[in-house]
């Protein structure tokens, strides 16, 4: 399993989404975060299994919530670029850089 580093803008995506779901329905943010944790485990175990959307960025489709997770593999580390709602403008996450 590879190490995962969640970059600051992806951390903000997660926080914003968790707050949204907490306001929408009690306990929904916990479900969202649990599914994200499962996604991180799957990506960590099989990072090359998920499709490239733009070299070197890969996409993981999150089940039960309308989100995609975008990441880059560099050496033995997986960097999470975005946890992005499907209806948001993809140009936002496409401008994100690893460094």
Predicted regions, residues:
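Basic, Lys/Arg-enriched alpha-helical interface segments
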Residues: 1-57, 99
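Active-site phosphate/pyrophosphate-handling residues
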Residues: 5, 66-68
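Conserved catalytic core of Hanks-type protein kinase domains
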Residues: 42-43, 63, 72, 83
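Short acidic-hydrophobic surface loop/beta-edge motif
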Residues: 58-62
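Enriched for short, Lys/Arg-rich terminal
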Residues: 68, 72-99
């Amino acid at each position: 399993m590879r190490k995962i580093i969640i970059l600051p803008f992806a951390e903000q995506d997660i926080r914003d989404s968790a707050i949204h779901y907490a306001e929408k329905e009690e306990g929904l943010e916990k479900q969202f975060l649990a599914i994200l944790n499962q996604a991180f485990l799957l990506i960590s175990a099989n990072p090359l299994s998920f499709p490239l959307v733009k070299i070197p960025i890969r996409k993981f489709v999150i089940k039960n919530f309308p989100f995609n997770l975008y990441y880059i593999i560099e050496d033995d580390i997986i960097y999470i670029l975005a946890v992005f709602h499907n209806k948001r403008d993809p140009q936002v996450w496409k401008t994100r850089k690893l460094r």
